[in-house]
């Protein structure tokens, strides 16, 4: 079985928590896009883990984890992440972690260039809100064919690889020197860095596609893990305030390494309210007062897992979520962090937009989203801790009514509802996987 777990909104929906649960019955968990520019948070009996590159399945010893061809991989960051979780007793080795030889390397200059450009824009009051992890520059160089792939690390003594490295470095020194007045990098230092990475990661680098194909053909359960959400997709998101990769489920088999395989299920993950990290239109934050937003931010601990930045917050946005569901094609829906709303007497929900007093018929990522005004419907809250609820029937009637209202607005059934951060805190409402 091939299952993709994707974000419906701007990211930070709780995909890691859902994937961790699915990994209990999975054989393989594979990331298929992005880099270390976002974090998946998983809470186990060992505490809280924040994973930037490693798939959420790494916390399950019998699961093989994969970093797929569609990713850009900061190897220095990956090494640190591996060390950090190994210190906490999590096993990481070539038997349970495989890196695609086709994945793109995030080179040392990508973070440098990202930071320099963000600083330049900030001086003009036009900062993009980049994570400064070099993701856009790594993807840009991938499509310009001016970077290395992981498989190249296995052939550093070959003339063709060394010639490419010379060509890449010459071009990059011209860019960084001409645009940002940086000192040139030396070829010898760069080659030494590559050799160091090869020494550490060579046992992990392989033809991931062949491994995944064999697993799929033998009936293994493969979970494909997305990063960020539909609103950040490079093609279908709110451009230019997007990531630099395809976050949609349709890309999952391709980015993982098995483009000929068809998904059996798409799990779309939604948070019980709206959050966003980074710049760009986000109507939900204007629906209520800043005091209300701050109360929600504190209740939900809404600070970026990768950056630590306070997340922009607001009520659940049905308009944006309907669009995200269409983009992802989800047949299963997980709603996370319902417990965060437990302290509210009334719970607002965005059910529509207006622009210049006229109702907006649908969500258009290329329209004037920064000027739309949210239309809010208010539902009664529940003054009860729901973290101990083990079944749908145990939830307060107001909590059930809230979920059912969202279902009606979205036109989709919600099968999974999380009632706390811990693994066991969830209830099932419908037929799950």
Regions found by a protein language model. Name each.
Residues 1-433:
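Non-transmembrane, aqueous-exposed alpha-helical and coiled segments at domain scale
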